[in-house]
Every structure is written in C-alpha cells, then in structure tokens.
Design a protein with these regions (language model features):
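Charge-rich, low-complexity N-terminal segments
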Residues: 1-102
Length: 102
C-alpha cells in the first residue's frame, strides 16, 4: 500500500488558485480512496497504480486550462499494510497518551 502526499497548483493563474485545487479535490473525493486534505496538500492511501492514476487525472483536469503546473509528491510504500492514513497518527497518539490536533 502507498501513502501519497501531493500538491498541485497552476503557476499561471495568479495568487488565488483554490478553484483549481477544488477541481482536483472533487476528483480525489469521487475516487473512493481514503484521503486527508491538509492546508498544504492532500494525502491519499491506495495501491500504487490507483494513486498514480489519481495524480494523472488531477493533472489532466488542470492542464485543460493551465499552461504551467507545479506538482510536489512524497510517496511512502509499505507492503501489505492497510489503514496507515489513520493508523500512523493513532500510533503516535497512543505513545503520547493523548489525542493530537490533526
């Protein structure tokens, strides 16, 4: 299983790009894959091909009307381990003995 953290935004659409980010989030939400939106990007959990197809779909949507796109990705692969999107946070919280702000 893969945890993929990524952000994608156009460089040629000015300072406010939430319209374009929202389009990507619509694609991510409709994918059915577990995800977590953060202020700086989105974390998605799935098989390699699933998460890469999701990035491709977001890119294709954005490239319809954007000439320059910045994408950052960080990938964590762990064979056979599911539920890490929440499990990694729960593991840290259990060691601290309290719930953290997420």
């Amino acid at each position: 299983m893969v945890l993929l953290e990524f952000s994608m935004s156009p460089f040629d659409k000015g300072a406010s790009v939430s319209e374009y980010v929202a389009r990507s989030l619509d694609i991510i939400d409709k994918s059915g894959l577990p995800y977590q939106l953060t202020a700086m990007g989105t974390i998605v959990e799935g098989e390699w091909d699933e998460v890469m197809a999701l990035v491709t779909a977001c890119f294709k949507s954005m490239s319809r009307d954007c000439e320059r796109i910045s994408t950052s990705m960080k990938i964590d692969f762990r064979a056979g381990k599911r539920g890490r999107l929440k499990g990694k946070i729960q593991s840290v919280e259990s060691k601290l003995g309290r719930t953290l702000s997420t």
